[in-house]
Amino acid sequence: EEGNSQTIATLTGATDNVLYQAASYDFRLLRFRLRGYDSEYTQPTINGVTMNDAARGRFNYSMLGGLNQAFKNKSIGMGLEATAYSFGDVGGANNIATYAKDYAPGTRASVAYTNGNYYLRGMITHATGLNKHGWALTASAAVRYSDQGIVPGSFYNSASLFLSLQKVFNPQHSLSLTAFGAPTSRAANTATYQEIYDLLD
């Protein structure tokens, strides 16, 4: 079924609800569906703009790939609960805020070596904070790489970029520009049978 590869991992840390936390962290690999609803019944937004794919009706989480530090400011609405950014949906609603002034000023960098889909991940994020002229800038970059993952032939190559620029005119008015991208090239593994290989020979 289309959308099976979508998880609710972005809910981690976004709510105090115990079920959401457990489902997001413990069951994400099992493609847990909150309340049994498919991902097309959730309302994901970035800065209040609905981000569901127009053709599939689902949010493409891979476009946020590797930008954990940039997309960490989240709010969750459970079920049909109205939020500051939407009226909600039967599967819930979540908003990711990327306003540059909301990031803590400074630089944060991390490097990780893993044994999963990729074996090397590097991230760096820099935020200026809001200066006296009302400008704020946040930039982030990430790289994930593996010439071969834990399954032979499963390579992974991803580079991600994020930029948020904001001009605050007064406490009620600001203008914000956010741009991001995560071009990824990867191989996926799947279960198969010897019969398939025999048919291909």
Predicted segments — roles?
Residues 9-50, 79:
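Extracytoplasmic beta-strand/coil segments of soluble accessory domains associated
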Residues 20-22, 49-80, 94-99, 103:
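Short acidic/polar hinge/loop motifs at secondary-structure boundaries
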Residues 29, 39-41, 69-71, 89-91, ...:
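Extracytoplasmic
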Residues 33-35, 43-45, 75, 93-97, ...:
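Soluble periplasmic/extracytoplasmic beta-strand elements of cell-envelope proteins
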Residues 37, 66, 97-101, 129-131, ...:
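Structural signature of outer-membrane beta-barrel channels/translocons
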Residues 108-146, 150-189:
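Transmembrane beta-barrel wall of Gram-negative outer-membrane proteins
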Residues 189-201:
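Solvent-exposed loop segments that connect transmembrane elements
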